[in-house]
């Protein structure tokens, strides 16, 4: 009964004497073969049987010794030592010594399906061996894996894999070679080097300086003295008191050749012409102007700058000078005279500090060489924003300013120019495309007496023959301050040419370039007497307005 129950309860079925791989047939795949459904049908068929006797048999088998149990199922002991010690040991101890024979369905299926496909067709009966006819070693010729594999089994499997790959475990085991036994043996040098007869290699080194002979303080004094003798005192002045003195290899080499005689080394260093300069030599004014002119023409192409304008310098010196020049005041002046200076305020449209802008305009006007405005070939742009500082002039300020202008333009200075200039009536007017000319339509004077100082109009210029006076033509400054006059109509009615007391017959006056430009915000606050005193210092021509500019 126990045998029948054991055979019926086997989940796999009976296995043949030989180990075969399970290969489902086409019928099993088509009809969806299911082992569990077959087991359920067998259980339904055995419902009428009594399983109480089977339970009793299982209990008896649990109490039976291992040798009797193996003999009952047809097993023979393959290990004699185990058989001999079975009499002296309990069944529990023997069970611990035996490997765990509990296998899962998945593990058995993996082992059965992992072999080579030798036979394509087999049945379920061929998969299960006969339990009563063969030994355990014949059931499973290959080791089966279980859920309770110990670490020793894992190591043995790894060794088997390494052996199968062709490498022994000793070859795959790497050792860290540290110690005296692993060090390389360096043979002693057998040859001898003679400095007089032979050289270590073809290009022999040359000793330039030996630092252990003189004291460091004396060496520093020597370097400072050589710098002063060779014209590098400017470089030394820029060095702060806490910094070290820069080494000069050429000077130290001269000191070594003189056997560390400082006086002799200084004389030889200054006389042989090989003194190395610690900094770049100063650029002349001509070189600076040529560099700036070439920079405007070629941009930052220093090769063209050196080739075209500054041939006395190398390209490296031009590059070094450019970065020094960018940080100097000369660059600021250069930017004001070129397009860079004109675009400075355009890049910042939100500027509200007009005092700084007025100072810049004044510096640009005052820093240029005195030249005539009549030689200008293009009109200057009018500032975009009004200058509010001009509206703060009072009558007393204008009177003082007029007296200073009258002092500069005295009758003697004016008379000396009468022979050099033609009469004003015969002087041609300037071309409109070059210089804007003032006409009567431009003098828009308000009739209500309100100030209109911000309505600046263009200035008039007259061309004159200045060849006897000016031999060289210089450029106008890039930035000029435009000024105009707005006179109320009530003031013009009170003022007449006859009341001014000006003699037009004896003197002919001309506009010169040494006068200052003045803009009056409002003449409404001035009386007729003050106005006459203000205008008596000047000579008026056909127009009531004269634009005077100061270069």
From Swiss-Prot:
Region (Disordered): 1-62, 113-169
Taxonomic superkingdom: Eukaryota
Biased composition (Low complexity): 1-16
Domain ELM2: 174-273
Keywords: Nucleus, Phosphoprotein, Repressor, Transcription, Transcription regulation
Location of the protein in the cell: Nucleus
Matching SMART domains: ELM2, SANT
A cellular component annotation (GO) from this entry: protein-containing complex
Modification sites for Phosphothreonine: 163
Main location: nucleus
Domain SANT: 278-330
Annotated InterPro entries: ELM2_dom (IPR000949), Homeodomain-like_sf (IPR009057), MIER/MTA (IPR040138), MIER1/3_C (IPR045787), SANT/Myb (IPR001005), SANT_dom (IPR017884)
Bias (Acidic residues): 154-163
Pfam families: ELM2, MIER1_3_C, Myb_DNA-binding
Segments of skewed composition (Basic and acidic residues): 17-36
Function: Transcriptional repressor.
Name of protein: Mesoderm induction early response protein 3
Organism: Mus musculus
